[in-house]
Amino acid sequence: MFEKVNPKHPDKIADRIAGAIVDLAYTQKEDPKIAVEVLIGHGECNIIIECDNDLTLNKVAIQQIVNRISESEPKLNLKIVPQDVHLAANQNDVLKCGDNGIFKGMPITDEQETLTNIAYDIYEKYNSDGKYIFVADKLIICQSKAGKELNEEYVDAKVNPLGYWTGGIDVDSGATNRKLGSDMGDAVTGGGLHGKDLSKADVTVNIYCHILANKLGKEVKACCAIGDEEVLGCSYEKMIKIVKEYIKDIGGFEKLAEWGLIRP
């Protein structure tokens, strides 16, 4: 049983905006400290950023990111605040886990891979908001701006049960980290995957567990406390390097947000 959404789903638009802002932070510092929350919809985009004092994240640059990804010009309500001094001090000497967390990485299943590829193929054709479900042999396709030809292509699927719909951020609001099931499948996390730098265990340990689970072909469980320098027998500094390379290969944090860890 698996649900997948495409990059134009409102929640993924929020994730992508948050990811793009993190990408911007990484152009300014090698190891920035940043956390981004995005709520977008109905002509407004609300963003709260907690970050290093020396990051220069100006409103013009962020508005450009919002406009590009949302393909609109929503009113931007932006609040940028410095990272808490105690959290910042945690990273003074060496890179350590920036928060507490529980994690379980899981191998990608055939069902998840199949549905993700179906979602990608449909998205390539329609390039608009879509959500898809695969349960055993039952396929449900909710694809905005799609005509009857989609029914003809997927004759055994349940396609758009309510008929034609437009979708997008003028129909539904989007928020960061609200589609973790789509991003991570059977994996378990105590926190969100998007809008955070690599000092945040919710990003780094989640992705490391995912990489390891798919390499070993079995579940990988981990937990950490804020300030831990080692998880699963691996130094956090080394773990960050591994995950940074993984994200670099994908194309950055914005690209990670498009499809999550289960990718076409």
List the model feature ranges, each with a label.
Residues 1-264:
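A domain-level signal for the structural core that forms small-molecule/cofactor-binding pockets
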